[in-house]
Amino acid sequence: MMTWSGNQIPAAFTTVKGRKPSVEIHKRRVSIMSVINELIRTEANGTLSFGNYSLAAKSKVEDFEHEGDLYKVKTFKEITKIERNGMFVYESVPGTAVKDFAVTDTTVTFKVEGFEDAQITVQLEDDCEYEVFEDGVGVGGMKTNMSGKLSLSVELNEGREVEVKIVRK
């Protein structure tokens, strides 16, 4: 991901029809998260990144090893799905790029980007309540169903990532 702020923002991102950018644009932080070209990878901080919503055709990687588990990812513009040891972990419709995906006993965190708003489903603990945050703002409590799936909608725009945090109550 590339991050700029203030006067560091390249001219290509700030000029509007030959005019100087507004102060608001100059002060705004701009983040650009790229898709995961290799479809899945382990980050230096030990988290997973996966998904490429820019692909026209479905692509997949199987048997990707991470911390002793085998992952399978399928991704393209219509869907991104990842499984761990044959079990469901994450799915988005339409497809997304996910960065820094991490799971603990009580929390799931990740950054997500896509072309448009996405319906995201994650596997959690069965029949439990969770608090969901998007970019640090609480969007409400949600309860998983009997199979442990939690679904949420995330407003996405290409070039802007949203930080999602799901915490068990």
What is each model feature region?
Residues 12-14, 18-97:
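Catalytic cores of secreted or luminal carbohydrate-active enzymes
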Residues 104-106, 119:
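Non-catalytic accessory regions flanking glycosidase/transglycosidase catalytic cores in CAZymes
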Residues 111-128:
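Surface-exposed beta-strand/loop patches in extracellular or lumenal glycoproteins
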Residues 2-6, 11:
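Extreme N-terminal basic, low-complexity initiation segments
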Residues 59-84, 92, 118-120, 144-169:
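C-terminal beta-strand-rich structural cap/linker in extracellular carbohydrate-active enzymes
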Residues 97-100, 107-110, 141-142, 151-155:
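Beta-strand-rich interaction surfaces with strong enrichment in secreted/lumenal proteins
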Residues 129-133:
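Surface-exposed interfaces of beta-sheet-rich extracellular modules
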